[in-house]
Amino acid sequence: MILTPTQADLDLFAELSGDANPIHVDPDFAAKSGFGRTVAHGAMLTAWLVRAAGLSETPSSTSAMFPAPAFAGEALVVVHDGEAWQLARQQDGVVVCRLLLNAPVPSEEFLVVSSEASLPLKLGMTRESETEPKADTFATLQGLQSRAGEKPLSGEAAQILAGQAYMLGLISTLLGMELPGQGTNYLKQETSWLGSIKPGEKVHACVTITRLRPEKALVDLSTRVQNQRGGILAQGRALVSARDVKGAF
């Protein structure tokens, strides 16, 4: 299967999730970044691979790594290596997303660094959001995901997968827009899925810094999504690069 993330796809996912990180939607900003041009959201690539896996049941966890950028307009090939699902650039074979399904997700622990006192970013820094999905958000996400699906899904399964994609988008938004901020590059996201979004409910997302590695411009964070009653829907951890985030280190 060949999937090509167009700039229109990136703009649409940014609109649906709120993640307007300029490395995805601003060609001028991206041209000055380490990428040189706009790149696809890791959350969107994950949503595509989950759909491409053709699962009979929705996953209990997703563990995605993004070892290289997926550029807007470049074709990607879906590959299954027996253990993981991958998206690789058709042009050079470089893997841009590697996904494990239903694997254990370790908890994130706080790790202190000796130079933290002098850093703008601090352990325990948190950013939160509260959103209520629009009525057509999940239908639009289902349409975007369906491009990666060779097998039809039941209405309930498609709704749950769209909800998971939406929650990944909320986490991505906090990382890419607030903490560390604009220019953030997603490297890894591990998520346990503990519940699903109910129509008409507000959703609360939260990310918290748990580790800083200034020598590599890396930031580890815990990630969580809850419903309006406080029930945990998603819990996990993220690893990002703040190389292109102004003033991060």
Across the structure, where does each feature detected by a protein language model lie?
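Hot-dog-fold acyl-thioester-processing enzymes
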Residues: M1-S60, P106-T184, K246-F249
